[in-house]
UniProtKB/Swiss-Prot annotation:
Required for initiation of meiotic chromosome synapsis. Involved in synaptonemal complex formation, a structure that tethers a pair of homologous chromosomes along their lengths and plays a central role in recombination and homolog segregation during meiosis. GO terms for cellular component: chromosome; nucleus. This is Protein ZIP2. Belongs to the ZIP2 family. The keyword DNA-binding applies. It comes from the Eukaryota. Its main location: nucleus. Keywords: Cell cycle, Chromosomal rearrangement, Chromosome, Chromosome partition, DNA-binding, Meiosis, Nucleotide-binding, Nucleus. GO terms for biological process: chromosome segregation; meiotic cell cycle. GO terms for molecular function: DNA binding; nucleotide binding. It is found in: Nucleus; Chromosome. The gene is ZIP2.
């Protein structure tokens, strides 16, 4: 709204004009008036001129012909500006007792009681005016020099009756209560859980806070209309209770029971018995005899019917028609119980400082070993020499050296002791035939030695010859802990990447293998009722098919407990499916060698791993590692990967994905969308 204000600071008006023109002179009113160009030009000329401007009152029916006057009359205003001089009328002056000083400041708000001496002709004028009851005097008839107290107020005998001409209608405010009552809250909750859901998950439903109106009834129940009385009623509304007297007909009850019988015949429904007269409690109506039963068929048919139609009927029962019994020979076969074999972890033997080369001893069953069997010694020795000199990436074929003193075998059970004893005899025969160092003799010689032997390994410089082709991904969360190993791998030209894997693993070796680097003392750290390291390994087994654990130790820890390494191995064997290696803390080259042996050469490069796409983001939600994602997308597309069946997906991509990941993907694909 555009507002303007009349500037009347240059005008010298009396207080009487302030009462007549309201708030125009006090600058209290703001109006927006649309004027045409001639009127704007005329108003601008009138305000900038030096002439005296005067206000005069214009009635609704009067019009001076000016465009400004005509315009303001249309908008129902009470004052206009007129350019020009107005000649004052020569009105008779009132004579007062004391001379009036025009320079004296007189308060017009005070009331004066004075007597006015008038002549006889003036009295006649007043008497004639009183008969007409109209003493209205125009303001412009009097001179400005005449004081206001001698003037007669305009229309003082008639009520003005001023009302607001331009009323503003404000919109009615919307009731907040009515608006909230009209809103409906609809919620849908699924009644089933996803497949293969973990039972240990705590499911909590958040309550939806809806503002309730305790003093108002949303669903109002209309009661019966009552006459208006002065009695006060409670606000509780009760539903009317209609009492119904059910007629107990014995014949109908009998027919209902007969319908449940399998031998019931439909002809019984043709004959119905009317209720007795005493069951109807009517006023002044009594029946002496009950109503005779009537057939619901015509009389002609009744004559031809046999009155005892059920006497000669020999209908079979429903059970005889629908069911038949025969002897069937059933042979119950008992199925053999098959227990799933849990793969155990490997047992690593600690070796002495003397370099000894033989294969790592794996956990095998006692039934598979025959101590009386004889093998060709020459072929076995050649096989061991070839394994020691051949370069391979399979960790089971890598040669290493271990030592195991008698004090550190105290926890091993009887079956495992017999297996190790047979293995010793076999290695003894091999060492005698080849003339090499006998590991059993070495073990027997070190029984009386100190148990604080250093763990040494025979390393090969050929382990790093393909370092440029191997990509090792470190977890960005544990970079501060593994910075020494990262620097060592950088110096040997390995491609080292850093990514946030979102799990407890330290290194991602390939598409299905992860590596954990921990101290041996962290295995026995306990929180509340669980071991943090064991819980982390269980979580990693859901994401990776193979979990490799490197436990670093120091000579001081072995000096405190000689059986610490084997106790740790026994505890980790309970998990199953893990491979544990004991490495000395200072052996960075040894750790790098094992990491190089576990890494494959067909891993994607740095650009392929860091390049993100929509398909990779979808597969990341199923807890799949980056190398496995690249391997899957290199073989097929995302649409084809999700559209195939569960068995085909497990057959084609089972080497990258675990059973938990396959089940998670299958739950997502077979999910039902409810409205």
């Amino acid at each position: 709204m555009v507002s303007a204000m009349w500037d009347t600071s240059a005008l010298k008006l009396r207080n009487i004009f302030e009462e007549e023109f309201g708030g125009y002179l006090e600058k209290r009113l703001r109006e927006s008036i649309q004027l045409n160009r001639p009127t704007k030009r005329y108003l601008k000329l009138a305000t900038r001129s030096d002439i005296d401007l005067k206000f005069h009152k214009v009635g609704k029916k009067e019009s001076n012909g000016s465009s400004l006057v005509k315009y303001i009359i249309e908008f129902d205003t009470t004052a206009i500006l007129v350019k020009g001089y107005i000649r004052p009328w020569n009105n008779p002056e009132w004579k007062c007792k004391a001379p009036y000083n025009s320079n004296q400041n007189v308060d017009t708000r005070s009331l004066y009681k004075e007597k006015i001496i008038v002549r006889d002709n003036v009295k006649d004028l007043f008497s004639a005016a009183l008969t007409k009851l109209d003493l209205s005097v125009r303001l412009n008839k009097f001179d400005q020099n005449v004081h206001a107290k001698y003037r007669l107020n305009e229309d003082f005998l008639q009520p003005l009756g001023r009302t607001l001409r331009h009323s503003c209608e404000f919109p009615v405010m919307h009731s907040r209560l009515v608006q909230r009552e009209s809103e409906l809250y609809e919620e849908f909750l699924s009644y089933d859980l996803p497949k293969r859901q973990m039972t240990t998950m705590d499911i909590q439903f958040k309550t939806v806070k809806v503002q309730s109106f305790q003093q108002y009834k949303i669903q109002y129940i209309q009661t019966l209309t009552r006459e208006k009385t002065s009695q006060e009623y409670t606000s509780s509304a009760r539903l009317p209770h209609w009492q119904s007297n059910q007629i107990q007909n014995s014949s109908i009850k009998f027919l209902k029971l007969c319908c449940e019988d399998e031998d019931f015949h439909p002809l019984e429904l043709y004959k119905l018995e009317n209720p007795k007269a005493d069951q109807f409690q009517r006023k002044a109506v009594y029946r002496s005899k009950p109503i005779k039963p009537k057939w619901r068929i015509s009389d002609e048919i009744i004559k031809r019917l046999n009155w005892n139609p059920f006497k000669e009927l020999n209908l079979p029962k429903n059970s005889e028609l629908l069911e038949s019994l025969r002897d069937v020979q059933v042979r119950c076969t008992s199925y053999a119980l098959v227990f799933k074999r849990i793969p155990s972890s490997k047992i690593d033997l600690m070796v002495s400082k003397i370099p000894v080369s033989f294969r790592s001893v794996n956990a095998i069953s006692y039934d598979q070993f025959d101590p009386k069997s004889k093998e060709n010694v020459q072929e076995s020795s050649q096989c061991i020499d070839s394994l020691a000199n051949e370069e391979t990436t399979d960790v089971d074929e890598v040669t290493n050296k271990r030592i195991m003193t008698s004090g550190k075998r105290s926890f091993i059970n009887a079956d495992l002791v017999s297996i190790i004893a047979a293995k010793r005899s076999k290695l003894k025969r091999l060492s005698i035939s080849n003339g090499d160092v006998n590991p059993v003799a070495t073990l027997n010689e070190t029984v009386e030695q100190s148990t604080m032997s250093n763990v040494t390994f025979q390393l090969s410089d050929k382990s790093f010859h393909n370092a440029e082709e191997k990509v090792i991904i470190f977890n960005a969360e544990y970079i501060a802990k593994n910075y020494k190993l990262i620097n060592f791998l950088h110096q040997n030209n390995f491609c080292v990447l850093e990514m946030d894997l979102g799990d407890h693993s330290d290194i991602l070796l390939d598409a299905s293998t992860c590596l954990i680097l921990r101290n041996i003392t962290s295995v026995y750290q306990k929180q509340v009722d669980s071991f943090p390291l064991l819980r982390a390994i269980q979580e990693l087994k859901c994401k990776y098919k193979r979990v490799v654990i490197f436990l670093s130790y120091s000579e001081r820890s072995l000096a405190l407990d000689s059986n610490l390494a084997y106790k740790t191995q026994l505890l980790l064997n309970c998990l199953g499916g893990t491979t544990t290696h004991l490495v000395e803390e200072t052996q960075l080259k040894l750790t790098a060698t094992w990491i190089s042996l576990y890494c494959g050469t067909n891993t994607p490069n740095e650009q392929q791993i860091y390049r993100m796409s929509l398909s990779k983001e979808v597969l990341q939600h199923f807890d799949i590692n980056p190398i496995a994602i690249e391997s899957i997308l290199s073989l097929t597309s995302l649409e084809e990967f999700l559209s195939i069946s569960y068995g085909k997906r497990a057959l084609l991509y089972g080497k990258f994905l675990t059973e938990y990941q396959l089940a998670h993907i299958d739950d997502f694909v077979t999910m039902s969308w409810s409205e």
